[in-house]
Regions:
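Acidic, surface-exposed loops and disordered segments
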Residues: 1-213
């Protein structure tokens, strides 16, 4: 699978098979994370590999996401925020988030290449994770990746069409209206999601108000 196809088809598993994930594959995934771009080349990221069922259950409880217990392997992505702050200054947290996001994307891409599926979990109980896994004060968990062989085929999430999110020279100048015959994939995709539903609601409300006036 080439990089473009991997990016377009990347999705999160819904249910994990109990087949073990080979450590050779885990190592390759971690190498991808280790080589992520880093602001100022600080290289703030660190990783904890979790395999024990009891430990995975802790992650599931802290995050409210049962997939982290189902998946045979989880990786806690950490950032040494103190190290980043010394180099970057007050914007250190944004820099750590950027580095972590870049690492996670690369790790998930390699996981897909290796025939695995993954999920990226944030919004968990930070203190529970720090306490449960002995993480020091200057290091912050940025997210958790679950790795598995999926129990069923993983479908990528729906995306906005390119003409809804790509503009030319100025905002709202849709790129498809500028380049006649442009053959970019996704250019003619239209997705029935939030913005369009909001627009429909607005016009229906406007019609009702017109009837009342």
């Amino acid at each position: 699978m080439n990089v473009f196809d991997a990016v377009r088809n990347l999705g999160s598993f819904r249910s994990a098979d109990d087949k073990p994930v080979e450590r050779k594959k885990v190592g390759k995934i971690l190498e991808a994370g280790r080589h992520a771009p880093s602001p100022g080349n600080v290289q703030s990221l660190e990783f904890i590999v979790i395999e024990e069922e009891e430990s995975r259950a802790k992650l599931a409880e802290a995050s409210g996401d049962p997939r982290l217990e189902e998946a045979p392997v989880a990786v806690i992505v950490l950032a040494d925020t103190a190290r980043m702050r010394r180099r970057i200054g007050d914007e250190f947290h944004d820099a750590c988030n950027a580095e972590a996001a870049s690492a996670v994307q690369g790790m998930r891409m390699v996981a897909k290449e290796e025939g695995l599926s993954s999920c990226w979990v944030t919004g968990f109980d930070q203190m529970a994770v720090k306490t449960g896994f002995g993480i020091p004060e200057n290091v912050e968990p940025m997210g958790i990746i679950g790795l598995c062989y999926p129990r069923s085929e993983v479908e990528p999430d729906h995306r906005f069409g390119m003409n809804e999110v790509v503009f030319y020279e100025k905002y709202d100048n849709q790129v498809g209206s500028v380049f006649d015959g442009l053959e970019w994939e996704g250019l003619h995709e239209n997705t029935e999601i939030a913005s369009k539903k909001t627009k429909r609601f607005y016009w229906k409300l406007k019609e009702r108000l017109s009837d009342l006036i």
